[in-house]
Amino acid sequence: MKLLAVRRLFRIQRVVIRYRLDDLLFEQPLLPWWLASLRLLMPWRWLPRKPTELSRGARLRLALQDLGPIFIKFGQLLSTRRDLLPTDIADELMLLQDRVPPFDPQKAVALIEEQLGAKVGEVFSRFDVEPLASASVAQVHAARLKTGEEVVVKVVRPGLKPVIAQDLAWLFLIAKAAERASADARRLHPVEIVGDYEKTIYDELDLLREAANASQLRRNFEGSELMYVPQVYWDLCRPKVLVMERIYGVPVTDMVTLADQRTDMKLLAERGVEVFFTQVFRDSFFHADMHPGNIFVSTVKPWSPQYIAIDCGIVGSLTAEDQDYLARNLIAFFKRDYRRVAQLHIDSGWVPAHTKVNEFEAAIRTVCEPIFEKPLKDISFGQVLMRLFQTARRFNMEVQPQLVLLQKTLLNIEGLGRQLYPDLDLWSTAKPFLERWMRDRYSPKAVFGNIHGQVEQLPHLANMARDLLERLSQPHLNDPQLPERRRQGDRWALRLLGAGLLGGGAVLAAGAAEAASLAAPAAWPAWLMLAAGLYLIVRQ
């Protein structure tokens, strides 16, 4: 194992020298003098090297490609962090392709038989030895079940964990060295990024997780005209083997075939946006790897086109609070209400509470005002989010993994939509959805549902307050004034109830007031909470 690690180190070093990645480090202006002086000790610095016309982004991309699949996937993850990376590097890393030669089909068969506990011929009436596709983590074979259904069988590459562990160790080492060496590198949080990648890559090795994600997504879009997700055959799924329905469709990037079958491209592009917002705001569960290779279009109804999604290894979800703040941020942004955007970032906890709202507002205005020089249809939602995150990053915004996945997915959907239909107006397509979502969120039914949930918690709050006051009075159990102390405790508990109702009513009223501009119903349930809270406080 140690010998393999040393060999890997020499390979990494050779690639670094070949693509002059050492120049990227030593060009840093704030590099400590002792580290900068190490450049003189590197023997290859004194050897003649051919000048390169490649950009720094291209050199980094080619180096990652040379280092193999684990580094390629890491580069793909990096490309989604546009809130951290310079644009030229992020654009180059987007070009990385996760394509590797297939492994021995007999090893795939052996692994399937080991996982299923049965011979391939006992499970499938046909199994194609030649793989349909091959990537760094797994490869896919076509097959037919004994019952006649056409399926695909996804198999994890054998012996992958030791390779991943070794490459991750080197990535962590490089990240830690970069953090110590450069202030700019520290701002990018490389160790944190490698940590995120470690979780992602190990999650992708568990195909049961992917199967569960696919089942959830299929259930969410059951009977929908927007998107179809293939069926998972759970009886044949194991940690290293996934069996699911084989789909037949047109790759979403095959414009010629889509045009030949007279697909409604405008509707297809708009439905892509609707799929995104449905996943994010209705389901709070979204496919986070919607690049063109994972998206197909059904051939059944070209006049009412339906997407087909595969490969659900990476998904994201948002809390109700994240959904709410995201919707309000988008609405406030398109109203050019930058103070509201700044305040929402602070209220949500995305930036520290001590952030000066005026300074944050000014920074957002400086970055975002130029965007509105374009027509609304030319404004990129993904770019808006990216610029907001970049600005917030300067004010110590904490990394929100779910928002990073969201931004990546939105950029994919948006790019795809405009490729299908260049005149796609994302805001006009999204606005009705956001209006409907805000209206439903603050409808009387939804508000009463929230009140019901809060009311269920009120007895617990009262009991907790009373118990606390009784514990505080324990040293005085023989005190003749104990009954009066208990009555005081009850009054304090009711005051706390009143304060809770008052606060909850204020929050609901504020939300409903904001939704009112989007044609939401009146917020009278919130006023009931405010009145009840005020009554309890005054009465006690």
Curated annotation (Swiss-Prot):
The chain crosses the membrane at residues 24-44, 496-516, 518-538. Its EC number is 2.7.-.-. The keyword 4Fe-4S does not apply. One of its GO terms (biological process) is ubiquinone biosynthetic process. Keywords: ATP-binding, Cell inner membrane, Cell membrane, Kinase, Membrane, Nucleotide-binding, Transferase, Transmembrane, Transmembrane helix, Ubiquinone biosynthesis. GO terms for cellular component: plasma membrane. It comes from the Bacteria. InterPro entries: ABC1_dom, Kinase-like_dom_sf, UbiB, UbiB_bact, UbiB_kinase. Its main location: membrane. Pfam families: ABC1. One of its GO terms (molecular function) is protein kinase activity. The keyword Cell membrane applies. CDD domains: UbiB. It is a multi-pass membrane protein. ATP binds at residues 132-140, 154. It is found in: Cell inner membrane. It is an enzyme of class 2 (transferase). Pathway: Cofactor biosynthesis; ubiquinone biosynthesis [regulation]. Residues 126-494 form the Protein kinase domain. Is probably a protein kinase regulator of UbiI activity which is involved in aerobic coenzyme Q (ubiquinone) biosynthesis. Belongs to the ABC1 family. UbiB subfamily. This is Probable protein kinase UbiB. The gene is ubiB.
